[in-house]
Amino acid sequence: MKWMNGSRKIAAQWLFLFTIFLTVGLAIPPVVPAFANDQQEATQLVEKARLTLDSFMSDNNMGAFRDLLKKADGVLISPELLKGAFIIGASGGNAVFLVRDKKTGQWSCPAFYTIGGASIGLQIGGQASEVILLVMSDRGVTSLLGNSVKLGGNVGVAAGPVGIGAAASTANLSADILSFSRSKGLYGGVSLDGSVVAVRSRLNDAYYGRQVSPTDILVRRDAKNAQALALIEDLSKSAAKKSTAMGELLPMAMSQDPSCG
Protein backbone atom coordinates (compact mmCIF):
# COMPACT_ATOMS: atom_id res chain seq x y z
CA MET A 1 0.00 0.00 0.00
CA LYS A 2 2.91 2.31 0.76
CA TRP A 3 4.23 2.04 -2.77
CA MET A 4 0.77 2.94 -4.10
CA ASN A 5 0.64 6.02 -1.87
CA GLY A 6 4.13 6.98 -3.06
CA SER A 7 3.09 6.60 -6.69
CA ARG A 8 0.06 8.76 -6.10
CA LYS A 9 2.21 11.48 -4.51
CA ILE A 10 4.63 11.41 -7.45
CA ALA A 11 1.75 11.53 -9.92
CA ALA A 12 0.23 14.46 -8.03
CA GLN A 13 3.55 16.30 -8.06
CA TRP A 14 3.95 15.78 -11.79
CA LEU A 15 0.38 16.95 -12.37
CA PHE A 16 1.08 20.05 -10.28
CA LEU A 17 4.28 20.83 -12.22
CA PHE A 18 2.52 20.26 -15.54
CA THR A 19 -0.27 22.63 -14.49
CA ILE A 20 2.27 25.31 -13.55
CA PHE A 21 4.13 24.83 -16.83
CA LEU A 22 0.91 25.06 -18.83
CA THR A 23 -0.25 28.16 -16.96
CA VAL A 24 3.07 29.97 -17.38
CA GLY A 25 3.29 28.91 -21.00
CA LEU A 26 -0.12 30.36 -21.78
CA ALA A 27 0.80 33.57 -19.97
CA ILE A 28 3.89 34.15 -22.12
CA PRO A 29 3.00 36.21 -25.21
CA PRO A 30 3.61 34.59 -28.61
CA VAL A 31 6.95 36.27 -29.27
CA VAL A 32 7.75 34.49 -32.51
CA PRO A 33 4.43 35.23 -34.28
CA ALA A 34 4.58 38.87 -33.09
CA PHE A 35 8.14 39.19 -34.40
CA ALA A 36 7.07 37.67 -37.72
CA ASN A 37 4.17 40.12 -37.97
CA ASP A 38 6.49 43.05 -37.27
CA GLN A 39 8.89 41.81 -39.93
CA GLN A 40 6.09 41.54 -42.48
CA GLU A 41 4.76 44.98 -41.59
CA ALA A 42 8.23 46.51 -41.95
CA THR A 43 8.82 44.83 -45.31
CA GLN A 44 5.49 46.04 -46.67
CA LEU A 45 6.14 49.56 -45.39
CA VAL A 46 9.46 49.76 -47.25
CA GLU A 47 7.81 48.71 -50.52
CA LYS A 48 4.91 51.13 -50.04
CA ALA A 49 7.41 53.91 -49.33
CA ARG A 50 9.13 53.16 -52.64
CA LEU A 51 5.82 53.40 -54.50
CA THR A 52 5.00 56.68 -52.74
CA LEU A 53 8.36 58.16 -53.72
CA ASP A 54 7.87 57.08 -57.32
CA SER A 55 4.39 58.60 -57.42
CA PHE A 56 5.71 61.93 -56.13
CA MET A 57 8.46 61.92 -58.73
CA SER A 58 5.95 61.45 -61.57
CA ASP A 59 3.43 64.01 -60.28
CA ASN A 60 3.33 67.25 -62.28
CA ASN A 61 2.42 69.14 -59.11
CA MET A 62 5.62 68.06 -57.38
CA GLY A 63 8.19 69.96 -59.45
CA ALA A 64 9.47 71.88 -56.41
CA PHE A 65 9.67 68.63 -54.45
CA ARG A 66 11.88 67.07 -57.12
CA ASP A 67 14.23 70.07 -57.07
CA LEU A 68 14.45 70.24 -53.28
CA LEU A 69 14.98 66.49 -52.96
CA LYS A 70 18.38 66.97 -54.60
CA LYS A 71 19.39 69.22 -51.69
CA ALA A 72 17.90 67.16 -48.87
CA ASP A 73 20.03 65.56 -46.15
CA GLY A 74 17.30 63.09 -45.25
CA VAL A 75 13.91 61.83 -46.43
CA LEU A 76 11.07 60.54 -44.27
CA ILE A 77 8.30 58.79 -46.24
CA SER A 78 4.86 57.95 -44.86
CA PRO A 79 2.84 56.02 -47.47
CA GLU A 80 -0.40 56.55 -45.56
CA LEU A 81 -1.00 59.19 -42.92
CA LEU A 82 -4.55 58.83 -41.67
CA LYS A 83 -6.42 61.78 -40.26
CA GLY A 84 -9.98 61.84 -38.96
CA ALA A 85 -11.37 65.24 -38.18
CA PHE A 86 -14.45 66.85 -36.70
CA ILE A 87 -13.62 69.75 -34.36
CA ILE A 88 -10.67 67.73 -33.04
CA GLY A 89 -8.38 66.14 -35.59
CA ALA A 90 -6.03 63.25 -34.90
CA SER A 91 -3.44 61.92 -37.31
CA GLY A 92 -1.15 58.93 -37.39
CA GLY A 93 0.89 56.72 -39.67
CA ASN A 94 4.10 54.78 -40.09
CA ALA A 95 7.15 56.01 -41.97
CA VAL A 96 10.68 55.16 -43.04
CA PHE A 97 13.61 57.56 -42.75
CA LEU A 98 16.77 57.51 -44.87
CA VAL A 99 19.81 59.79 -44.60
CA ARG A 100 22.27 60.91 -47.25
CA ASP A 101 26.01 60.75 -46.56
CA LYS A 102 27.29 64.24 -47.35
CA LYS A 103 30.71 62.99 -48.43
CA THR A 104 29.67 60.17 -50.74
CA GLY A 105 26.09 61.07 -51.61
CA GLN A 106 25.03 57.53 -50.68
CA TRP A 107 21.76 56.82 -48.90
CA SER A 108 21.40 54.75 -45.75
CA CYS A 109 19.10 51.81 -45.15
CA PRO A 110 15.68 52.82 -43.78
CA ALA A 111 14.87 53.29 -40.11
CA PHE A 112 11.26 52.95 -38.99
CA TYR A 113 9.18 55.66 -37.34
CA THR A 114 5.62 56.62 -36.54
CA ILE A 115 3.97 60.03 -36.96
CA GLY A 116 1.17 61.07 -34.62
CA GLY A 117 -0.50 64.22 -33.46
CA ALA A 118 -3.69 66.04 -32.64
CA SER A 119 -5.05 69.40 -33.67
CA ILE A 120 -8.03 71.47 -32.60
CA GLY A 121 -10.01 73.39 -35.16
CA LEU A 122 -13.19 73.41 -37.22
CA GLN A 123 -12.41 70.62 -39.68
CA ILE A 124 -14.68 68.43 -41.74
CA GLY A 125 -14.29 64.88 -42.93
CA GLY A 126 -11.41 62.45 -42.88
CA GLN A 127 -8.23 62.19 -44.84
CA ALA A 128 -5.66 59.69 -45.99
CA SER A 129 -2.48 61.21 -47.37
CA GLU A 130 0.89 60.20 -48.70
CA VAL A 131 3.46 62.38 -46.95
CA ILE A 132 7.15 62.95 -47.56
CA LEU A 133 9.28 65.11 -45.30
CA LEU A 134 12.48 66.51 -46.74
CA VAL A 135 15.01 67.06 -43.97
CA MET A 136 17.10 70.02 -45.09
CA SER A 137 19.55 70.51 -42.22
CA ASP A 138 21.92 68.67 -39.90
CA ARG A 139 19.75 69.80 -37.02
CA GLY A 140 16.75 68.13 -38.60
CA VAL A 141 18.60 64.86 -39.10
CA THR A 142 20.01 64.90 -35.56
CA SER A 143 16.59 65.56 -34.04
CA LEU A 144 15.20 62.43 -35.70
CA LEU A 145 17.97 60.24 -34.31
CA GLY A 146 16.43 60.51 -30.84
CA ASN A 147 13.47 58.52 -29.56
CA SER A 148 10.97 61.22 -30.52
CA VAL A 149 10.78 64.78 -31.77
CA LYS A 150 7.95 67.30 -31.90
CA LEU A 151 7.66 69.00 -35.26
CA GLY A 152 7.40 72.75 -34.95
CA GLY A 153 8.64 72.59 -31.37
CA ASN A 154 12.03 70.91 -31.24
CA VAL A 155 12.61 71.36 -34.95
CA GLY A 156 11.18 73.76 -37.54
CA VAL A 157 8.75 72.42 -40.16
CA ALA A 158 7.05 74.18 -43.07
CA ALA A 159 4.85 73.11 -45.96
CA GLY A 160 6.72 72.80 -49.23
CA PRO A 161 5.46 74.51 -52.39
CA VAL A 162 3.07 72.31 -54.38
CA GLY A 163 1.38 72.85 -57.72
CA ILE A 164 2.18 73.21 -61.38
CA GLY A 165 4.63 76.07 -61.69
CA ALA A 166 5.45 76.15 -57.96
CA ALA A 167 9.15 76.93 -57.62
CA ALA A 168 11.59 75.55 -55.10
CA SER A 169 12.80 79.11 -54.54
CA THR A 170 9.49 79.92 -52.82
CA ALA A 171 10.10 77.33 -50.09
CA ASN A 172 10.82 78.41 -46.53
CA LEU A 173 14.52 77.61 -46.65
CA SER A 174 14.95 78.48 -42.98
CA ALA A 175 12.88 75.44 -41.99
CA ASP A 176 14.70 72.29 -40.94
CA ILE A 177 12.01 70.12 -42.53
CA LEU A 178 9.77 70.70 -45.55
CA SER A 179 6.57 68.64 -45.80
CA PHE A 180 4.87 67.53 -49.00
CA SER A 181 1.59 65.64 -49.17
CA ARG A 182 -0.80 64.11 -51.67
CA SER A 183 -4.27 63.87 -50.17
CA LYS A 184 -6.85 61.21 -50.94
CA GLY A 185 -9.61 62.48 -48.66
CA LEU A 186 -12.13 65.26 -48.32
CA TYR A 187 -9.82 68.14 -47.50
CA GLY A 188 -6.39 68.87 -48.84
CA GLY A 189 -3.17 69.73 -47.13
CA VAL A 190 -1.73 68.12 -44.02
CA SER A 191 -0.54 70.29 -41.15
CA LEU A 192 2.21 68.46 -39.28
CA ASP A 193 3.02 71.31 -36.92
CA GLY A 194 2.82 69.84 -33.42
CA SER A 195 2.98 66.23 -34.60
CA VAL A 196 5.39 63.85 -32.92
CA VAL A 197 7.75 61.62 -34.89
CA ALA A 198 8.84 58.63 -32.80
CA VAL A 199 11.06 55.61 -33.40
CA ARG A 200 9.37 52.23 -33.96
CA SER A 201 12.00 50.08 -32.30
CA ARG A 202 10.11 46.82 -32.79
CA LEU A 203 9.98 47.28 -36.55
CA ASN A 204 13.66 48.23 -36.67
CA ASP A 205 14.63 45.14 -34.68
CA ALA A 206 12.37 42.82 -36.69
CA TYR A 207 13.49 44.15 -40.08
CA TYR A 208 17.21 43.83 -39.33
CA GLY A 209 16.98 40.68 -37.22
CA ARG A 210 18.59 42.17 -34.13
CA GLN A 211 18.33 45.11 -31.76
CA VAL A 212 19.36 48.27 -33.60
CA SER A 213 18.98 52.00 -33.03
CA PRO A 214 18.41 54.74 -35.63
CA THR A 215 22.07 55.71 -35.18
CA ASP A 216 23.14 52.14 -36.01
CA ILE A 217 21.08 52.24 -39.20
CA LEU A 218 21.46 55.83 -40.38
CA VAL A 219 24.90 56.90 -39.13
CA ARG A 220 27.03 53.82 -38.44
CA ARG A 221 25.26 51.94 -41.26
CA ASP A 222 25.91 48.52 -39.78
CA ALA A 223 22.36 47.19 -40.29
CA LYS A 224 21.56 45.32 -43.51
CA ASN A 225 18.50 44.10 -45.39
CA ALA A 226 18.62 43.51 -49.13
CA GLN A 227 14.88 44.10 -49.44
CA ALA A 228 15.53 47.83 -49.02
CA LEU A 229 17.78 48.07 -52.08
CA ALA A 230 14.91 48.84 -54.48
CA LEU A 231 13.85 51.84 -52.38
CA ILE A 232 17.44 53.04 -52.02
CA GLU A 233 18.11 52.74 -55.75
CA ASP A 234 14.96 54.70 -56.63
CA LEU A 235 15.86 57.38 -54.08
CA SER A 236 19.46 57.56 -55.34
CA LYS A 237 18.27 58.19 -58.89
CA SER A 238 15.58 60.66 -57.85
CA ALA A 239 17.85 62.67 -55.54
CA ALA A 240 20.96 62.62 -57.74
CA LYS A 241 22.47 66.07 -58.02
CA LYS A 242 23.40 67.55 -61.38
CA SER A 243 26.59 69.40 -62.13
CA THR A 244 25.95 72.97 -63.23
CA ALA A 245 28.49 72.79 -66.04
CA MET A 246 27.61 69.62 -67.92
CA GLY A 247 24.15 68.84 -66.56
CA GLU A 248 25.23 65.28 -65.88
CA LEU A 249 24.46 63.20 -62.82
CA LEU A 250 27.24 63.26 -60.27
CA PRO A 251 28.71 59.73 -60.02
CA MET A 252 28.89 59.82 -56.22
CA ALA A 253 25.16 60.44 -55.97
CA MET A 254 24.37 57.49 -58.18
CA SER A 255 26.72 54.90 -56.72
CA GLN A 256 24.91 53.28 -53.83
CA ASP A 257 26.74 51.62 -51.00
CA PRO A 258 25.86 47.91 -51.21
CA SER A 259 26.14 47.56 -47.43
CA CYS A 260 22.37 47.38 -47.11
CA GLY A 261 22.33 44.18 -49.14
Predicted regions and their residues:
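Bacterial N-terminal signal peptides
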Residues: W14-P30
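Small-residue-enriched, tightly packed secondary-structure blocks
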Residues: F35-G261
